């Protein structure tokens, strides 16, 4: 029976630094501290960190000399976690909201649908306007196109149509992007 590879969580990926004695295979490091930047032996850097009751954290292992900092690792992890949560909060996922209308829509119903579309566009979401035909209404697809173009025109100050409306079988569809 084979063992499953472990799944790393988001926090594990964020904190992939080697700390103190876990930094191996290094004889000299570029040490960043309050005193400035210096190239010292690994043992000396570790000794300085222990004297200050702090941790020696490997920040970058990409260069010839590994870059290490003398910091409080617990506090550093907390700050990184806080920054990542703050960045995640600021992200906005764009959703596509759908507004369904009919070719013979009453004016009040049309205004309500338009108001909802404006709210969605104001929140930064895309709006998919779909007009559905029933039965013999398909014979008058030009009426449906007029309603859809009217909706696009009325929402012009809130968003722009991705492309011209497309008739797809028994419906006309257009997607409006927020400004």
Swiss-Prot record:
It comes from Leptospira interrogans serogroup Icterohaemorrhagiae serovar copenhageni (strain Fiocruz L1-130). HAMAP family: IF_3. Keywords: Cytoplasm, Initiation factor, Protein biosynthesis. Its main location: cytoplasm. GO terms for biological process: ribosome disassembly. Monomer. One of its GO terms (molecular function) is ribosome binding. This is Translation initiation factor IF-3. Belongs to the IF-3 family. It comes from the Bacteria. IF-3 binds to the 30S ribosomal subunit and shifts the equilibrium between 70S ribosomes and their 50S and 30S subunits in favor of the free subunits, thus enhancing the availability of 30S subunits on which protein synthesis initiation begins. The keyword Repeat does not apply. The keyword Cytoplasm applies. The lineage of its organism: Bacteria, Pseudomonadati, Spirochaetota, Spirochaetia, Leptospirales. It is found in: Cytoplasm. The gene is infC. GO terms for cellular component: cytosol; membrane.
